[in-house]
Amino acid sequence: MENAAPRDGMFIHLSNGPEDPHRVLMALKMAEVMSADKDVLMYLDIEAVRLVVKDAPDVSKEGFPSSLEQIKKLLEAGVIIQACPTCLKVAGYSESDLMDGVVLANKEKFFTFTQGKTLSIDY
């Protein structure tokens, strides 16, 4: 029996926050689509960290599920969502303010979340 090829990965970088719903929701939708058969890691920095704190606004735009709905679905699907610790601090938050399932960014995880090739997309 042959070993299965390692799954490829998708690294999605999101720096825009609630003020840009189209970019936010497109990044989350792309993570959902790719997670069907790829390993996915989302890295949120700059303004995007405000999307994954416990009191995050529920960003919406016609044609997309809301941000809170998508984030919940992604976490349930095993997508890794990491928040930049420095950006979190600058925004006035700490690790304890993150939604359950969202973690502080870990540079080692950037290189180990998948065993296959990695494609990166930036929003």
Describe each PLM feature range:
Residues 5-6, 11-25, 52-56:
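Short, glycine-rich nucleotide/cofactor-binding loops
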Residues 17-19, 47-50, 87-91, 111:
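Solvent-exposed loop/turn segments at secondary-structure junctions
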Residues 31, 40-46, 82-85:
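Short internal beta-strands
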Residues 58-87:
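A glycine-rich helix N-cap at a beta->alpha junction
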Residues 77, 82, 95-99, 103-112, ...:
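A short aromatic-anchored loop/beta-hairpin motif
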